[in-house]
Amino acid sequence: MSDSRPSGRQPDQLRPVVIQRGFTRHAEGSVLVCFGETRVLCTASVENRVPGFLRGKGEGWVTAEYGMLPRATHTRSDREAARGKQGGRTLEIQRLIGRSLRACVDRNALGERTITLDCDVLQADGGTRTAAITGAYVALVDAVNVLMKRGDIKRNPILGAVAAVSVGVYRGTPVLDLDYAEDSDCDTDMNVVMNDGGGFIELQGTAEGHAFRRDELDALLGLAEKGVGELLAAQQAALSA
């Protein structure tokens, strides 16, 4: 029933998705992605260098950084730079974003250069990491297209599309794309990263209250597949615009 969710959405319904390319001027790729009221700025920057462990190997690197503006949430948080270090949650999320994007790149075709995806949360209402992955992919494609047009690389290193969505069990019902009201009151929370071939790149699932059953897990994965399919279509529509 739609009235079982605070937003009134159906259990298998995404929030409205907006992917706006070219949001800032200077980066090779720049995307504002919105999952409902969650808004993340994703920029892709190209540098002609690689980490030390890759020097001389002819391979490129894709990495990510993640952060939230101080008032992205209901109350202001200090900037992590002011604290002198990144928090554990930040490190976990940016590593997830980096892993997810590396899964769709032929790093040999990229050559010895690094593409950094900076994902800055402007407004948080749940699902910031999944929105970041979904938007960062589009920014990555735009950056690669710049390299192709400049003749810096000879073949496209993008192997396929990647998108991510959250699913969870909210008041006994498996639901798709949790907002903050659901995420803060759910029994199970899971983030699912998939590619356009239907393969799973990463699954992060935790029982917040009661342990989830196998049938609930299967239902959640089914919802995630549906949601990712719709997000992949939104990415393609944005890239074709």
From Swiss-Prot:
Pfam families according to UniProt: RNase_PH, RNase_PH_C
GO MF, any single term: tRNA nucleotidyltransferase activity
InterPro entries referenced in this protein's UniProt entry, alphabetically: ExoRNase_PH_dom1, ExoRNase_PH_dom2, ExoRNase_PH_dom2_sf, PNPase/RNase_PH_dom_sf, Ribosomal_Su5_D2-typ_SF, RNase_PH, RNase_PH_bac-type, RNase_PH_CS
Its job: Phosphorolytic 3'-5' exoribonuclease that plays an important role in tRNA 3'-end maturation. Removes nucleotide residues following the 3'-CCA terminus of tRNAs; can also add nucleotides to the ends of RNA molecules by using nucleoside diphosphates as substrates, but this may not be physiologically important. Probably plays a role in initiation of 16S rRNA degradation (leading to ribosome degradation) during starvation.
Name this polypeptide is given: Ribonuclease PH
Family: Belongs to the RNase PH family.
Keywords noted in UniProt: Nucleotidyltransferase, RNA-binding, rRNA processing, Transferase, tRNA processing, tRNA-binding
Quaternary state and interactors: Homohexameric ring arranged as a trimer of dimers.
Reaction(s) the record says it catalyses: tRNA(n+1) + phosphate = tRNA(n) + a ribonucleoside 5'-diphosphate
GO biological process: rRNA catabolic process; rRNA processing; tRNA processing
Keyword RNA-binding assigned: yes
Domain of life from the UniProt record: Bacteria
NCBIfam families linked: RNasePH
Annotated binding of phosphate, by residue: R89, G127, T128, R129
Record-listed E.C. numbers: 2.7.7.56
